[in-house]
A protein has these predicted regions:
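Conserved active-site segments centered on acidic
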Residues: 1-73
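Alpha-helix termination/capping residues and helix-transition junctions
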Residues: 4, 77, 97-100
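Redox-cofactor binding/interface segments in oxidoreductases and associated redox assembly factors
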Residues: 85-86
Length: 153
């Protein structure tokens, strides 16, 4: 679902744009895509979306299989209202975006660095997904509350 251009734009940044930022984008778009235009990008994009990130979001009914890894430079000429960084490296490499009103840094462990058996790695992806989901569902609920109480709503 694509939001109208008049909705506030949220850009979720991570270093590689392969795991955390895509999970956050999928979750936030599913929860608030009707009131927010949600994108993700990376300061050093990996060029792919991690298959386990796709798999653990599918487990909760969110399809990010069509997502692609993008550079934050692709958004420098966009009117971004909020930038949310989800890993430490992106916070230092994040430029000031035009029109940016809000900036948040919510660090999450990188599940791509998980080691162990296939199941242990999936457990780590699920743990990080659940942390991201809790944070971004709360953000979506707050955005909906603000939207419903604004004079133009």
């Amino acid at each position: 679902m694509n939001a109208p251009a008049s909705n506030p734009r949220v850009l979720i940044l991570c270093t590689g744009n392969s795991c955390r930022s895509h999970m956050a984008e999928g979750i936030l778009r599913a929860a608030a895509g009707d009131i927010l235009e949600v994108h993700s990008a990376g300061s050093q994009p990996s060029g792919f979306v991690h298959p386990k990130a796709i798999a653990v979001l599918a487990e909760i009914g969110i399809d990010i299989s069509s997502h692609t890894s993008k550079s934050m430079n692709d958004f420098l000429d966009r009117d971004i209202n909020t930038v949310i960084t989800v890993c430490g490296n992106a916070d230092q490499a994040c430029p000031i975006f035009p029109g940016q009103i809000h900036r948040h840094h919510w660090p999450f462990d990188d599940p791509a660095h998980a080691t162990g058996t296939e199941e242990e790695i999936l457990v780590e992806f699920r743990r990080v997904r659940d942390e991201i989901q809790a944070a971004f569902l709360a953000y979506a609920a707050e955005a909906k509350k603000i939207t419903s109480t604004s004079p133009s709503a």
